[in-house]
């Protein structure tokens, strides 16, 4: 049986540890667009835009705009809310 990459990825991202590592890897790229694209995938896998927006106390439109790789420039407060809504949190480590 063949499975599409996106389907496989979305299934894997349902696991919190995998999702955290996925976001950490995306954060290694110096381009914030990479992180926003990865976070968008995590949101999709862990409930979808509507549910995550509701849990984060954001409108769906605001969440879409926030995670837009073209225009997105989320605040720390918004990123924290989105991560919390997906069951994740920020972390910092030494280089």
Where are the regions a protein language model picked out?
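Long, contiguous binding/interaction regions
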Residues: 57, 81, 95
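Short, solvent-exposed alpha-helical "recognition" segments
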Residues: 70-76
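N-terminal flexible/basic segments that precede or flank functional cores
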Residues: 1-41
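Conserved interaction-surface patches within small, structured recognition/assembly domains
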Residues: 40-41, 65-69
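DNA major-groove recognition helix of helix-turn-helix/homeodomain DNA-binding modules
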Residues: 76-92
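Short alpha-helical DNA-recognition segment
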Residues: 45-65
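Membrane-interface junctions
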Residues: 28-29, 45, 69
């Amino acid at each position: 049986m063949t499975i599409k990459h996106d389907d496989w990825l979305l299934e894997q991202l349902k696991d919190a540890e995998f999702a955290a590592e996925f976001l950490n890897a995306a954060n290694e790229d110096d381009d914030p667009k990479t992180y926003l694209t990865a976070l968008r995938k995590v949101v999709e896998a862990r409930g979808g835009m509507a549910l995550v927006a509701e849990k984060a106390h954001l409108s769906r439109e605001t969440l879409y705009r926030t995670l837009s790789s073209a225009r997105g420039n989320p605040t720390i407060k918004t990123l924290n809310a989105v991560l919390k809504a997906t069951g994740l949190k920020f972390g910092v480590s030494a280089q």
